[in-house]
């Protein structure tokens, strides 16, 4: 009894030991994490890249921005898409935005391009004999106070050795006296730029009215947009969307006042890099526009003056009517209300202090006045009357004036413009004929704050300007460019099967706007959108190439490829290079054409000790990328080393005879091949059986078919030399044997005719009977054939059913046999192991019995 109990206990311990061993193995297998590569994850990083532009410019427009946009920009998308990124917070900084620098360089190149084919006015650096413009006719007034000078000078004609005296009108701001004389007197003058910079005359048919320009990111990059209505330009933004192109930005060149821009959606926004630093410019974004109407009332005429062969200088010829000063009109009520709101917002940043607005403290004319372009004429308007008020917090007084009154600010006009792009460059703007009127909207202010410690209870703000980057920054403050990083790495429990020959799927490739649509989702939720994101990346590249080809085709008639065309090519090449670089990495890692690629690289807990559930259920791809960014290069190197080792192992394995490794016989690939060969053999046997059955049926049909015999004997008529029947013959004699003996020509002819008719009748009757018999036999044969065909089909159906049952029985028998063999083999193995174990367990007892026997 004790022996049986010991055996039973050992058997239980053996079973529990096996179960525990397999549980430990399963736990170890499940506990390991492996590096998995994902292609198309919503991850990005801040980047600087070449942007291209889109515009609605027309090729036939002569306006300078349109000319530039036609040559450089692709058509705008009629249905722009914007994808909101849920649960995403992104940092923006309008003061360190590369988009602003790019737009600045683009506008500089725009102006340079517009002046490149125009006339250089170096020959105009001559002595000008000028006097104040006088009134030649009655009933005309001149309130300009010597603002316009009537100058005469000698100029070279078409023939270089001949000169002639010409007259032209110049603004006083464009000329300086040669001697220390008052500019109000008559005397000798020169153009203001002759001792400082070269001057180029703007082409006469070109104006400077801007059109909206959209900046677009190339494929592989995206533009993030902050949609917070009170965003001040810096810091985090929790309402982010991704777009392909910005809104249309008008490149308006102006100082002090921002014109024709976008408006704040809710309240006035104050933006500055550092409000406590009085050197930094303050950009005020208005929520309501203030209309400003500017007019040059003088009805000017323009005349052309020859300054050399093939060169013409355009100057003001005459002023028709009164000579009046240019000016701008602003509604006093609207302006005072706006300034009141601006003062209120500034007081929030400077509490317990009065906010005072004052005129500019001094400097160049371009920054001390509100300078802008009006239909080709450059205005410089004095804004002292606009910025001359004080806002006191908690005061009942408002900055208001007479209701419905108008603020009129005087303006001066210059034709020689110091280019804002750089020092030492100037441009001559030809006079525009007729009366000029411009209507614009003030959408922002450029201010600066006085420093020092003079007034502790008052902050003085003055209009500022001059750096056109602030103009572009006021429109591009809510955008930033990011680079898409479609390659993601994360730990999973799936491991790559190694040292196997596999057919890799052909790659499908990789805008664009839906690409980052899952950015705020968890990693597990975002991974299901990889296919869509990868396809949109490739479609973005293709779409950009298509747009580029259309843009080049539009300018093909002029055979021009300016710097803008080069930028387009750069963006195209950049997008393709990024795509190829990602595909190269996937190829090096053995992941070509795969969106999710398992690897044989184990995950190191030093990279991240988070659990798999925590990573995939609680983190976004952006958060995960930031966490492992320091180890990305290390993981990339390990992936490359693993793939190299994998390829080396495959090469070594393929070098051996595959039949030497019997284990490969039981691989799933070989079993599929065995099944395919078996199906082919069975199909061949069934086909042979069908062929022999058909041949047998045909043979039987042929044996049972007896056609009408054409050898049936018919009674032949006896000849005239044949004897009659014997005497014993009885019965009626045949008609052939009746021979009529006729004589005479008519009788013979009649007999022959009768014989011919009878012969024809009998032959025709026989032919009809044969045809009827043939038709009858053919019908019977056809019916018999249809019946036999139906029998053949039934036979084939039965044959197929029989063989299917046989195959089913064979398969069931095969599986039963395998199951029985496996069960019996398992039982035998268990019995052998139990026997060995019992033998081992009985060794002490046998030794004891041996000692007992020896001692006895």
Curated annotation (Swiss-Prot):
Annotated region (V2), positions in chain: 151-194
Single GO cellular component term: membrane
Pfam families per record: GP120 (PF00516), GP41 (PF00517)
Chain positions covered by the region annotation V1: 130-150
Start and end residues of each stretch annotated as MPER: 655-676
Biological processes per GO annotation: adhesion of symbiont to host cell surface via host glycoprotein; clathrin-dependent endocytosis of virus by host cell; fusion of virus membrane with host endosome membrane; fusion of virus membrane with host plasma membrane; positive regulation of plasma membrane raft polarization; positive regulation of receptor clustering; viral protein processing; virion attachment to host cell
Molecular function as annotated in GO: structural molecule activity
Tagged with keyword Signal: yes
Note: Inhibitors targeting HIV-1 viral envelope proteins are used as antiretroviral drugs. Attachment of virions to the cell surface via non-specific interactions and CD4 binding can be blocked by inhibitors that include cyanovirin-N, cyclotriazadisulfonamide analogs, PRO 2000, TNX 355 and PRO 542. In addition, BMS 806 can block CD4-induced conformational changes. Env interactions with the coreceptor molecules can be targeted by CCR5 antagonists including SCH-D, maraviroc (UK 427857) and aplaviroc (GW 873140), and the CXCR4 antagonist AMD 070. HIV-1 lineages are divided in three main groups, M (for Major), O (for Outlier), and N (for New, or Non-M, Non-O). The vast majority of strains found worldwide belong to the group M. Group O seems to be endemic to and largely confined to Cameroon and neighboring countries in West Central Africa, where these viruses represent a small minority of HIV-1 strains. The group N is represented by a limited number of isolates from Cameroonian persons. The group M is further subdivided in 9 clades or subtypes (A to D, F to H, J and K).
Name this protein carries in UniProt: Envelope glycoprotein gp160
Organism of derivation: Human immunodeficiency virus type 1 group M subtype C (isolate 92BR025)
This protein's encoding gene: env
């Amino acid at each position: 009894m004790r022996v049986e109990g010991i055996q039973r206990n050992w058997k239980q311990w053996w079973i529990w030991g096996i179960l525990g061993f397999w549980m430990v193995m399963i736990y170890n297998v499940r506990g390991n994490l492996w590096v998995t590569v994902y292609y198309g994850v919503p991850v990005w990083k801040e980047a600087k890249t070449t942007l291209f532009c889109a515009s609605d410019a027309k090729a036939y427009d002569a306006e300078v921005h349109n000319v530039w946009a036609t040559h450089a920009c692709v058509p705008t998308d009629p249905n722009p898409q914007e994808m909101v990124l849920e649960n995403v917070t992104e940092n923006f900084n309008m003061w360190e935005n590369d988009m602003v620098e790019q737009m600045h360089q683009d506008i500089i190149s725009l102006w340079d391009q517009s002046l490149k084919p125009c006339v250089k006015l170096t020959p105009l650096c001559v002595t000008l004999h000028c006097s104040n413009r006088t009134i030649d006719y009655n009933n005309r007034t001149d309130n300009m106070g010597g603002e316009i000078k009537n100058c005469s000078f000698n100029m070279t004609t078409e023939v270089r050795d001949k000169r002639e005296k010409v007259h032209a009108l110049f603004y006083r701001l464009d000329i300086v006296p040669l001697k220390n004389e008052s500019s109000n007197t008559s005397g000798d003058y020169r153009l203001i730029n002759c001792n400082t910079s070269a001057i180029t005359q703007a082409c006469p048919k070109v104006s400077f009215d801007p059109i909206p320009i959209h900046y677009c990111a190339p494929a592989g990059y995206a533009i993030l947009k902050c949609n917070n209505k009170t965003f001040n330009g810096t810091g985090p933004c929790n309402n982010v969307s991704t777009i392909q192109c910005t809104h249309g930005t008008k490149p308006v060149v102006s100082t002090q006042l921002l014109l024709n821009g976008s408006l704040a959606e809710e309240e006035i926004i104050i933006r500055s890099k550092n409000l406590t630093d009085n050197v930094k410019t303050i950009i005020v974004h208005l929520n309501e526009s203030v209309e400003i109407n500017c007019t040059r009332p003088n009805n000017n005429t323009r005349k052309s003056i020859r300054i050399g062969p093939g060169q013409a200088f355009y100057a003001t010829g005459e002023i028709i009517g009164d000579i009046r000063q240019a000016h701008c009109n602003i509604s006093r009520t609207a302006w005072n209300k706006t300034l009141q709101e601006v003062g209120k917002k500034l007081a929030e940043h400077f509490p317990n202090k009065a906010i005072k607005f004052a005129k500019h403290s001094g400097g160049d004319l371009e920054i001390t006045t509100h300078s802008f372009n009006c239909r080709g004429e450059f205005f410089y308007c004095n804004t002292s009357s606009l910025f001359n008020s004080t806002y006191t917090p908690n005061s009942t007084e408002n900055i208001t004036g007479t209701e419905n009154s108008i603020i009129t600010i005087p303006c001066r006009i210059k034709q020689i413009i110091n280019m804002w792009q750089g020092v030492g460059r100037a441009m001559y703007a030809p006079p525009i004929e007729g009366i000029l009127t411009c209507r614009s909207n003030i959408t922002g202010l450029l201010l600066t704050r006085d420093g020092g410690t003079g007034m502790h209870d008052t902050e003085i703000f003055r209009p500022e300007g001059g750096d056109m980057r602030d103009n572009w920054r006021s429109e591009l403050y809510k955008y930033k460019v990011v680079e898409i990083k479609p390659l993601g790495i994360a730990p999973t429990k799936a491991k790559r099967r190694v040292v196997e020959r596999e057919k890799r799927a052909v790659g499908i490739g990789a805008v664009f706007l839906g690409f980052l649509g899952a950015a705020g989702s968890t990693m597990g939720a975002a991974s299901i959108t990889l296919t869509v994101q990868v396809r949109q990346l490739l479609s973005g590249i293709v779409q950009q190439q298509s747009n580029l080809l259309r843009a080049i085709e539009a300018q093909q008639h002029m055979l021009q490829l300016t710097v803008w065309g080069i930028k387009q090519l750069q963006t195209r090449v950049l997008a393709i290079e990024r795509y190829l670089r990602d595909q190269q990495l996937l190829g090096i890692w053995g992941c070509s054409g795969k969106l999710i690629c398992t690897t044989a690289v184990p995950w190191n807990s030093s990279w991240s000790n988070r659990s798999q559930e925590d990573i995939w259920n609680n983190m976004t791809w952006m958060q995960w990328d930031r966490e492992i960014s320091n180890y990305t290069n290390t993981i990339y190197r390990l992936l490359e080393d693993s793939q190299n080792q994998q390829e080396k192992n495959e090469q070594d394995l393929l070098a051996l005879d595959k039949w030497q490794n019997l284990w490969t016989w039981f691989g799933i690939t070989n079993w599929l091949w065995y099944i395919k060969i078996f199906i082919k053999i069975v199909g061949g046997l069934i086909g042979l059986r069908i062929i022999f059955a058909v041949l047998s049926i045909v043979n039987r049909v042929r044996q049972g078919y007896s056609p009408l015999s054409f050898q049936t004997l018919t009674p032949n008529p006896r000849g005239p030399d044949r004897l009659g029947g014997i005497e014993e013959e009885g019965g009626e004699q045949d008609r052939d044997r009746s021979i009529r003996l006729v004589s005479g020509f008519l009788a013979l002819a009649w007999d022959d005719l009768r014989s011919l008719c009878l012969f024809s009748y009998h032959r025709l009757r026989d032919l009809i009977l044969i045809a009827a018999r043939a038709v009858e036999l053919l019908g019977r044969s056809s019916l018999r054939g249809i019946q036999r065909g139906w029998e053949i089909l039934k036979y084939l159906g039965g044959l197929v059913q029989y063989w299917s049952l046989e195959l089913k029985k064979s398969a069931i028998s095969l599986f039963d046999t395998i199951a029985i063999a496996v069960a019996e083999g398992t039982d035998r193995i268990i019995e052998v192991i139990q026997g060995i174990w019992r033998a081992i367990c009985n060794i002490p007892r046998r030794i004891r019995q041996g000692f007992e026997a020896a001692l006895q």
